[in-house]
Amino acid sequence: MASDADMEDYGFEYSDEEQEEQDVDIENQYYNSKGMVETEPEEALSGFAEVVQMEPEKADWGFKALKQTVKIYYRLGKYKEMMEAYTEMLTYIKSAVTRNYSEKCINNIMDFVSGSASQNTGLLQEFYQTTLKALEEAKNERLWFKTNLKLCNIWFDIGEYRRMTKILKELHKSCQKEDGTDDQKKGSQLLEVYAIEIQIYTETKDNKKLKQLYHKALAIKSAIPHPRIMGIIRECGGKMHMAERQWEEAATDFFEAFKNYDEAGNQRRIQCLKYLVLANMLMESEVNPFDGQEAKPYKNDPEILAMTNLIAAYQRNEIIEFERILKSNRRTIMDDPFIRNYMEDLLKKVRTQVLLKLIKPYTKIGIPFISKELNVPETDVTELLVSLILDSRIDGHIDEMNRYLLRGDSGNGRKLHKAVDKWNSQLKSLSSNITSRVC
């Protein structure tokens, strides 16, 4: 006859086996349901609901089943049911599943919903608010921070800047000490917040705030940020310098942005390489960016090839070829609003280089001849010559009667053109005064 101890052992063994069998049944039910997701979504939903019911208490399989349920309801366009399932799923994150696993799953669902519902702002708002509330209750600060960042990025992508203000304040507050100063120990998080704010100021062209934040971001030394974040900060810095006509500083920032994006495997590297080429030409640099080892692998990239040819024509001072490349590569060059914004500056630089080279052997040269060589109207040639004389880059003056540039006698030339320039300014001022009085 078995002892009490033997009976107890037998009982425990029987109990363990029963639990294992139950776990196997739940697992089988989960995978059978998952197999029907694509072909029979309604049947899959019933199966996943059964998985949740089969678990005696909240655990992994129920969490996984609810995650699948959320995705199916979303695909079916049943957003009310989706939110109900998602809200139930979030009750598991306090203790039923590990923090790392719950973070991974929630991130996965957020990416899934955000990627498909960017136009459904009402759903996104409810979805993220539900997530944030659950994360606050679970005291998961790290995922709360990441979720708010994701929400900010969604609003940024669809131009909802006002919606971002409150979230950014909360994010910034979470990176501060009790005295209200920035906590340098949270340098990486601070940079992520700064990167979003910097993008807003770049888009809204608020250069004053952009400059302040840009310098604050570069001053943070305690962080090891993701290269994508530094790519964003440097790209926006480059655009800021371009707006201020600081071509050299812009080129430095675009190069840093390119390197960071390249390290992160981000496609923005191609755009920043284009911007680097643009800044290099505007600063009249003789250095070809594609000669460096970092940019060399992209020299023959289809998106970059037009810029490669453009800088080659620029360095050879071939204005007609330069303009031909611009016209025949509208999609890769001129369709970018940022590049297009500086094209007049760039064309003026190229024409200036060609003009200076053209007039070098002559003491007297006809404006019609220059016009033909530069492929621009004579009035544009005259304007360009006047600006170069006033800037002391050409030693000479214009004989407007005979349509010649006469080199030498720069003093009289500059005095004459300064007087004409002053006269033009006074005429504009007089015209404005008369208009304002009449109106």
Swiss-Prot record:
Pfam families: PCI
Region (Disordered): 1-23
The protein, known as: COP9 signalosome complex subunit 2
Major subcellular location class: cytoplasm
Presence of keyword Nucleus: yes
Protein localization: Cytoplasm; Nucleus
PANTHER family: 26S PROTEASOME NON-ATPASE REGULATORY SUBUNIT 11/COP9 SIGNALOSOME COMPLEX SUBUNIT 2 (PTHR10678)
UniProt keyword annotations, A-Z: Cytoplasm, Developmental protein, Nucleus, Phytochrome signaling pathway, Signalosome
Stretches assigned to the PCI domain: 243-412
Annotated disulfide bonds: none
One GO term of the biological process aspect: protein catabolic process
SMART domains reported for this sequence: PAM, PINT
